[in-house]
Amino acid sequence: MSILPIIKGEYKKDYNLKHLTWFKVGGNAEIFFKPFDSADLKSFLIQNNKKLPITTFGSGSNIIIRDGGIEGVVIKLGKNFNNIEFLDNHLIVGSSCLNYNLAKFCQANAISGFEFLVGIPGTIGGGVVMNAGAYGSAFQDIIVQIEALDFLGNFLTFTNKEIGFKYRGNNLPKDLILLKAIFKANKGDSQNILLKMNKINTTRSSTQPIKERTGGSTFKNPVGCKSWELIDKAGLRGYRIGGASMSELHCNFMINNGNATAKDLEDLGNFVRQKVFEDSGVELNWEIKRIGKYV
């Protein structure tokens, strides 16, 4: 391990990440770093100069941390990166702000177009990276620009076009840490916005296992079909490996039934991919990220 950069924030060594993920599984971070602010993060990156490997971490909602843990430095942006500012008909939002909190802010301030965020777990930063979407809307529809640091500490901006949004992804460089996202704010009716959000919440609670230890949609939808339909057709609704299973309620959701390991979850996902391909000839691609050392 190289000498760690001098910082204002906080380092924790051999830090268990399990409690930070929605699945509640996984190993330790060799070094866990919460920067004090963007200047602190920039200073760390400049001093590090890519010597130590870096992994960024959001709310842990769509990720499997493998049981062998993560080498190098895991960076998690905290409360100093979750601000929401309404300025000149734009919203300037910190990357660690929860999607749900931005949706509630917009409802309270009669800003329309953000209702779908109430049904998407995770942070704004993760939503941009994944081009997260639901109920007919996605991040690509509302983003104007993002601000970021690369792993050398250079400050960069990208417009919506430069981000290169695609289905559940983008064409941004991989060595970026998102700081802020800027959105166009369109005025709407607060009561109508609330009605839309309530409808989304009702639909989610009746069709998704939101009270379980899950990571959201496991696989991206292939062109022209739904992953859950292919999984169901292959007879895998409720299928179980160890402490992990495909949800009975929505079979594109994996669940930790209480004693699953990260290996159980990843093995289950790969088994489902194999069986769906054998049954339908369609290759499912992971939507949930898997990071760390597989053991």
UniProtKB/Swiss-Prot annotation:
Active-site feature positions: R168, S217, E287
SUPFAM superfamilies: FAD-binding/transporter-associated domain-like, Uridine diphospho-N-Acetylenolpyruvylglucosamine reductase, MurB, C-terminal domain
Name of one Pfam family that matches: FAD_binding_4
Principal cellular location given in the protein's record: cytoplasm
UniProt domain FAD-binding PCMH-type: residue ranges: 24-188
Keywords: Cell cycle, Cell division, Cell shape, Cell wall biogenesis/degradation, Cytoplasm, FAD, Flavoprotein, NADP, Oxidoreductase, Peptidoglycan synthesis
Any one cellular-component term (Gene Ontology): cytosol
GO molecular function: FAD binding; UDP-N-acetylmuramate dehydrogenase activity
PANTHER family linked to this entry: UDP-N-ACETYLENOLPYRUVOYLGLUCOSAMINE REDUCTASE
Full protein name: UDP-N-acetylenolpyruvoylglucosamine reductase
Organism the protein comes from: Rickettsia typhi (strain ATCC VR-144 / Wilmington)
Gene expressing this chain: murB
